[in-house]
């Protein structure tokens, strides 16, 4: 018999995004070992990518399924298990900040990019030289550096330069 028992990350009525599917058929006779598993880190990466591409609701649907699995009733909401406790791949959820706000910083050009998919927002930002919050409110960017320095010469908001 099978002596190797893999962990189960979703079961029963749990929703989740499978690592691999064959919607048009053609499943291999020996598919790769993890193909039918659900990993939050992959789900968050796919969700943030969908958000970046403008498919915000599809991305949020994936996140809702993750959070329902880890809502504290059955699973620890602070320990999204993958390959052991406190596995780092779930930190891909950080990508949703960029996916929803479109915020990214170019330290060479000293440009802060904003391309919000959610309207006004206030979000955490971290660079190699500092961290704080970035806000888009009433058509204006506001950077509040809490520690260090984030040298911004211009803002690029949805493709338009704002000095």
Give the ranges of each region predicted by the language model.
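Domain-scale activation on soluble regions of proteins
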Residues: 113-115
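A residue-level signal for beta-strand positions that form part of recognition/binding surfaces
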Residues: 93, 111, 140
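Active-site core of glycosidic bond-cleaving carbohydrate-active enzymes
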Residues: 2-108, 118, 151
């Amino acid at each position: 018999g099978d002596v190797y028992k893999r962990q189960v990350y979703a079961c029963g009525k749990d929703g989740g995004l499978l690592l691999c599917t064959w919607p048009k058929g053609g499943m291999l006779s020996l598919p790769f070992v993890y193909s039918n598993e659900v990993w939050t880190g992959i789900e968050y990466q796919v969700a943030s990518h969908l958000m970046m591409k403008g498919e915000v609701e599809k991305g949020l649907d994936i996140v809702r399924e993750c959070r329902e699995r880890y809502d504290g009733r059955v699973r620890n909401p602070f320990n999204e298990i993958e390959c052991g406790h406190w596995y780092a791949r779930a930190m891909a959820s950080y990508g949703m900040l960029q996916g929803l706000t479109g915020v990214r910083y170019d330290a060479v050009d000293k440009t802060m990019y904003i391309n919000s998919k959610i309207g006004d927002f206030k979000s955490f930002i971290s660079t190699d030289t500092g961290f704080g919050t970035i806000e888009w409110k009433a058509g204006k960017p506001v950077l509040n550096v809490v520690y260090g320095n984030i040298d911004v010469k211009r803002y690029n908001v949805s493709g338009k330069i704002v000095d």
